[in-house]
Amino acid sequence: MGQKIHPLGFRLGVIKDHKSCWYADAKRYPELLQEDRRIRQYVEKNLANAGIADIRIERKADQVDISIHTARPGVVVGRGGTGIEQLRLGLQKALGGQRQIRINVIEVARVDADANLIAEYIAQQLERRVSFRRVVRQAIQRAQRAEVKGIKIQVSGRLNGAEIARTEWVREGRVPLHTLRADIDYSYKTASTIYGILGVKVWIFKGEIIPGQEEIAAAVPAQAPRRQQRRRQQFEDRSSEG
């Protein structure tokens, strides 16, 4: 079943946390849940060119804390902070009420190791009518440079304008979907082309997380770096086959 279930939902409470963190009674829960969806849709629509990787929402009484993880923080903040202020005012107007909205902008450290950003890159290239095999090969090479443990990319639809829709996928390295401690990043995007909609799915395996390992690692002091450089992991690119 690890092949069928959503990789992030499968690991909630084990190694993954919820993207919305708040508590509410039964009467207000549906309202706040729909409000979270409106917030995410508004941010993704107004910051479509900012490379949004993740949106986290926390609530404290009448205060809403929104953390935006982005590859281009300068686009979100704007000159002199005008961009983030316009976003905050727009959200207040869209939500209504007297809620205090606080926005935190966090830069993504490893852009090429984020499934959401890679899926968005593939979708944008497909909309520009670039060959899907070339796009997938480039995305895999970018992920390899980011030293991920494994990556799987699947593209579905009328590929290269073919009459019959089909599904093509490429995997490099390990992507253990059934292992709960495996840190799997997953994203799904759609590309609108003149031939129809193409679906893009990306799985990225970043390594294994053992619960409690972070506390043990923090307690042990860091050792001096070795002089011998660690050999980078190599992948065999099979995206051109078939």
Swiss-Prot record:
Keywords: Ribonucleoprotein, Ribosomal protein, RNA-binding, rRNA-binding
Disordered as annotated region, ranges: 220-242
GO molecular function: mRNA binding; rRNA binding; structural constituent of ribosome
Biased composition (Basic and acidic residues): 233-242
InterPro entries the record matches: KH_dom (IPR004087), KH_dom-like_a/b (IPR015946), KH_dom_type_2 (IPR004044), KH_sf_prok-type (IPR009019), Ribosomal_S3_C_sf (IPR036419), Ribosomal_uS3_bac-typ (IPR005704), Ribosomal_uS3_C (IPR001351), Ribosomal_uS3_CS (IPR018280)
The keyword ATP-binding is assigned to this record: no
Classification via CDD domains: KH-II_30S_S3 (cd02412)
GO cellular component: cytosolic small ribosomal subunit
Record-linked Pfam families: KH_2, Ribosomal_S3_C
GO biological process: translation
Location of the KH type-2 domain: 39-109
Subunit structure, interactors included: Part of the 30S ribosomal subunit. Forms a tight complex with proteins S10 and S14.
PANTHER family referenced in this protein's UniProt entry, alphabetically: 30S/40S RIBOSOMAL PROTEIN S3, SMALL RIBOSOMAL SUBUNIT PROTEIN US3C
Family membership: Belongs to the universal ribosomal protein uS3 family.
Role summary: Binds the lower part of the 30S subunit head. Binds mRNA in the 70S ribosome, positioning it for translation.
Protein name: Small ribosomal subunit protein uS3
Source organism of the structure: Microcystis aeruginosa (strain NIES-843 / IAM M-2473)
